[in-house]
Amino acid sequence: MAKIRIHEIAKELGYDSKEIIEKANELGLGIKTASNAVEPEIAAAIYEYIQTREIPEAFKKNIKTPTAKKPKKENIKEQEKLNESEKKEPKKEEKLKQEVKKEELKIEKENAKEEEKQEIIDAHKPQSLASATLAKRRGLVIVKKKKDEEEIQVKKEEVKNSNDISINNEERLSLKTMFSNADESLKKKKKEKKSFVASKKESTEKMNFLDEHDFGDISLDDEDEVVLPDFSVKEQEKPQNINKKQPNFIRQAVGNSAGFGLEGGIQRRSRKKPSKKIEKKEVEEVGSVAISKEIRVYEFADKIGKSTSEVISKLFMLGMMTTKNDFLDEDAIEILAAEFGIEINIINEADEFDYVKDYEEETDEKDLVTRAPVITIMGHVDHGKTSLLDYIRKSRVASGEAGGITQHVGAYMVEKNGRKITFIDTPGHEAFTAMRARGASITDIVIIVVAADDGVKPQTKEAINHAKAAGVPIIIAINKMDKEAANPDMVKTQLAEMEIMPVEWGGSYEFVGVSAKTGMGIEDLLEIVLLQADILELKANPKSFAKASIIESSVQKGRGAAATIIVQNGTLTVGSTVVAGEAYGKVRAMSDDQGKALKEIKPGECGVIVGLSEVADAGEILIAVKTDKEAREYANKRHEYNRQKELSKSTKVSIDELGAKIKEGNLKALPVILKADVQGSLEALKASLEKLRNDEIKVNIIHSGVGGITQSDIELASASENSIVLGFNIRPTGEVKERSKDKGVEIKTYNVIYNLLDDVKALLGGMMSPIISEEQLGQAEIRQVINVPKIGQIAGCMVTEGVINRGAKIRLIRDGVVVYEGNVSSLKRFKDDAKEVAKGYECGVGIEGCDDMRVGDYIESYKEVEEQASL
């Protein structure tokens, strides 16, 4: 069998080669280097010696045994003397016991508290004191004892507290007796009480436990014999309190070399064990954990008692790259809870500053009165919505609209038969989807206007879907009935396909034919509106705090932030303290849709208020509160909450999105600063501009706001390369124009949304790479191939289609497959150079870099044409 090298043994055991050499030499093998090889039997002996520290039988002859025979004889003699002294001198033991009792009383007075807490643990028989396992962990050398006489000798060498041998022997005997008594008492108690089985600890934990205690004066004698106490009983039994007081010399031993295994250390450990158990129970008994609907990663980790790194690692394993400050959505929270095995209860933290919820809880339903209905007019662009409202109001709003289309949400009051009706006019252009959705959500009745000569269009369908989603009644107004091309039956048929069935066809929807130009059917329409309002039984309490919806908001010169509102409940008065999202303040002034000053706005009525701290978001709920402090707290909490959410969104990205983010970094971007007159138009423009993108180009809105173009906007644009300033329904002042010229910033203003979007599309198209297309020039058939020295192949061709130009790009086609692409290097007609050869003529063609032309191949000539890309 092959020999085994020393370094192989060291590698397998995890030791250094030098250590293995030392151990081998202890066995008398005479190993010098790690490359020395030994027989497998010798290698097995080395394994056994290192692991058990016992010398194999085969090697005991090679090792010089320590001269321990003489001490053995002495030990035996001393043991015999000890036995004789035990028999002959029982009186000495009694005297010693009396002395022990005196020592007990003395120490009881001095250390009463300590004696109450002290415990004694069952010590094993003397044979177990030489535990090889514990000795190895302490790094001490143990010589295994085989006879009782050797054990007695070891004890005598360990304890040296007295010069008198006989007294010393008696004390050691008494100590042995005490431990044996303790062993018996513990066994009795073990039967009475349920044993406590401690959990098994790793070897490293046991070493740490031993390190916590003072070993006192542990010394090695000439024979390197060390005796350690046995812990096996302590790990299985719960320490019991011993009321019996111990003699002084035993307590000294407890604090000294033998004591670490008896009372002191074990007592401290026994106090720690119950605390750990309690902690575990507390963790297990934790029930449902309340988790906020919007919670950060580190907050979630704190809630469930895990480290942030654990949660982030788990999210990474689930395919989400997050930081500790990122917010978790509900799905992520539920998945994490399942992964960690925790029951959770998701709560909405936004309820803390939900002033609308607080308002609804406090609203008193007494004193309810009928309020004015709120009607929203919706439909496709240019179907006559504003014209219809103009006829009802006897106004000319439509004529003042830029481009003849509505681009704002307007709220108007109309009185019919002594009853007020509030109308909301919404834009029909596709860009104003958000405005139409808001109009449908705050209304009582929706009027869908459809042109009789045009039928149902995309925005008509969208408006119907918004109304259905809001769950409000729908009335269909078929407009332009005065035209010769009017076809109301076509409109009814198209709407019937969308499950909007007219009453006359057995449906539940009212259809009214009207003409905004002649006024036909207007009265009937208003009658149906009031009838529908009566069916709905619209009620409100004018005595409660006001609750209103913000239809539109803007910045008015000299007045500040203004908001168009419709009051839904309560009465809003001048001087009321209000809060709307992040905006708050006192109502300084209010006016109706025609600009007349008002002192109050009742339920169902509309108006414009001034006095908010900033421009409120369109669609926000406005609530009147008691104090300025309350309003400020609501607004500040909402502001901080929204800010933190926005910051988190900017950093959150999943693994699936990471590639898209990297790809997006290569996109060309058009930096834009966008300003508009009202919040609704700004939102519509932002949504439309963000849609103008493809794989190569996009619009980057670096700043947007409501109000005029300011010098700070120009400064921001100048700091951003190639940025432009876009204004909607606003004009720059003289100072701003001069500043823009100095900085080289281009300002473009518009009053029609179509024009703005078209110009931005053209700008984006100019930034895109041009589209390259091919234009076919001609084709020629190779009929002969001529090899010219130092030049290469020349193809004798017949032009079969179009023309072949010198310098043009060509393809060499063989059996319908392109085998080469290149340029025409030379073109000749007989011996003369030619610029081009037309169809039906023969020519010689040289192709740059091609030497594989064959008879029957075709040469196709073409040129590349660049076209401007468009979005």
From Swiss-Prot:
Disordered, as annotated region: 60-101, 184-203
G2: region residues: 404-408
G3, as annotated region: 425-428
Compositionally skewed regions (Basic and acidic residues) per UniProt: 73-101
PROSITE patterns listed in its UniProt record: G_TR_2 (PS51722), IF2 (PS01176)
GO cellular component: cytosol
Residue ranges with Basic residues bias: 61-72
Keyword terms, alphabetized: Cytoplasm, GTP-binding, Initiation factor, Nucleotide-binding, Protein biosynthesis
UniProt subcellular location: Cytoplasm
CDD domains: IF2_eIF5B, IF2_mtIF2_II, mtIF2_IVc
Region of interest called G4, as start-end residue ranges on this chain: 479-482
Residues the entry annotates as binding GTP: 379-386, 425-429, 479-482
Domain tr-type G: 370-537
Chain residue ranges for the region called G5: 515-517
Pfam families: EF-G_D2, GTP_EFTU, GTP_EFTU_D2, IF-2, IF2_N
GO MF terms, alphabetically ordered: GTP binding; GTPase activity; translation initiation factor activity
Positions of region (G1): 379-386
Family statement drawn from the similarity comment of this UniProt entry: Belongs to the TRAFAC class translation factor GTPase superfamily. Classic translation factor GTPase family. IF-2 subfamily.
Its job: One of the essential components for the initiation of protein synthesis. Protects formylmethionyl-tRNA from spontaneous hydrolysis and promotes its binding to the 30S ribosomal subunits. Also involved in the hydrolysis of GTP during the formation of the 70S ribosomal complex.
Protein name: Translation initiation factor IF-2
Organism of origin: Campylobacter jejuni subsp. jejuni serotype O:23/36 (strain 81-176)
Gene this chain is encoded by: infB
